[in-house]
C-alpha cells in the first residue's frame, strides 16, 4: 500500500487528530506602498480582511539629526530643521530659533515676529493642501490633488521669492529673519504651457510686492477651499470611507500624547497659539476648530477649517506689515550678520560675516524647551548649552512619532482598506518621525 493511501486511511479513521490549525496571516504594508507616505513599514496581523494587530517599524529614514546639530555651531543647524518635516519647513525652524533666543535672552523685532507668524500660517496652508490632496488620492479621488496643488504652487513661489528656495528655506534666523519681504514677485515667463491671455492672467497678481500678492491670495483662497469642499465634504463615497473610521476618543488621544488636528479632531481644544502664545499670535484674531466624533471625517473637517483660519491670520499680518516698516533682525551684532552692501566695501564687515558663519557664537549655559503649533501638532525643541558655540544636547519633539505610536491601538478591528484612510489622516512625514 502506498504512503498516500495510508495517510488517507488514517485521516478517515480519526479526522479530529488530523485537523490542521488555522492561524492569522501576516502582511507587510510598505515601505514601498504608495499610501505609506514615506518609508512606513507596517506589519499587519490579519484575520481575513480584519486587522488584529499592527506593528509599525521605523528608522528607515534615520539620519541622526540631533547628533548632527550637536556637532555644529548653533546657527549652522537651522537648515537641518527644514529637513525634518519637509512639508512644514518654517515651523520647524521657528521652534529651533526660539530655543536659541530663549537661552541668549534676545527677542526678534516686532516686524520679524509678524513675518514669522505669517509664514507659519503660509506653511500650515501648504501642509494641509498637500494633506487633503494626497489623502483624497489615497482613497480614490484624484481630482482634489490637482486642485490643491494649484494654490500650493502659488505659496511655493512666495517661499522662493523670500528665501530663494521652494522648500528648504532656512529663512528664520536667531534674532529675526534672513531679510525683509521683497518688493516684487517673480513672474511667469512665456512657455509652451503659459502663453497669451492665460499668461497675462497668471501674472496680473504679481505686478506689485509680495504683500500685494498675498493680499490678493487671501481674498481668493476661501473660494478655492469651497471648491475642495464641493468635491469632498458631502461626497457619498468620501463619507463612507471616513465617517466612523479610526475613531479616537479624547481619553485615548490624551493617553498617547496626541497634539494638533489629531487631538482637536477628538474634541479637545488645545492649541499652543492660544494656550501659550508666541510670536504675534496674541495680536491676531482666529478661532480653533474642533471635532466631535474623533473619526477620520472630523479630522478632515478640522484641517479644512484650519486653512480658513490660517487665511484670516495671514490677512491680518499683511495689513500690519504694510503699515509698519522696520528692522527684521536684532541689532546685537554677536548674532546679527552685517549687511550685504556693507561687506562689499568694508573688510571688517566681511571678516565679521566669515567668523559669524564659520565659528558661530557662544550661547550662555542653560537649558530650555520651546514648542510651536506646527501643522501636524506640537513640534518642540529641547536645547541645552554648556556655554560653548555648539549645543551640548538637542532633542526634538516630533508630533508624528507620538501619533504613529498609537497606530496599533487605533486600527484594531478595522478592515485593511480602512488602514489606508487612517494612515492618511495621521498626516505622517518620516523625516520628523525618524529624525
Swiss-Prot record:
GO terms for molecular function: NAD binding; NADH:ubiquinone reductase (non-electrogenic) activity; quinone binding. Belongs to the complex I 49 kDa subunit family. The keyword NAD applies. Keywords: Cell inner membrane, Cell membrane, Membrane, NAD, Quinone, Translocase, Transport, Ubiquinone. NDH-1 shuttles electrons from NADH, via FMN and iron-sulfur (Fe-S) centers, to quinones in the respiratory chain. The immediate electron acceptor for the enzyme in this species is believed to be ubiquinone. Couples the redox reaction to proton translocation (for every two electrons transferred, four hydrogen ions are translocated across the cytoplasmic membrane), and thus conserves the redox energy in a proton gradient. It is an enzyme of class 7 (translocase). It comes from the Bacteria. It catalyses: a quinone + NADH + 5 H(+)(in) = a quinol + NAD(+) + 4 H(+)(out). Gene3D superfamilies: Cytochrome-c3 Hydrogenase, chain B (1.10.645.10). It is a peripheral membrane protein. Its EC number is 7.1.1.-. InterPro entries: NADH_Q_OxRdtase_suD (IPR001135), NADH_UbQ_OxRdtase_49kDa_CS (IPR014029), NDH1_su_D/H (IPR022885), NiFe-Hase_large (IPR029014). NDH-1 is composed of 14 different subunits. Subunits NuoB, C, D, E, F, and G constitute the peripheral sector of the complex. This is NADH-quinone oxidoreductase subunit D. It is found in: Cell inner membrane. PROSITE patterns: COMPLEX1_49K. One of its GO terms (cellular component) is plasma membrane.
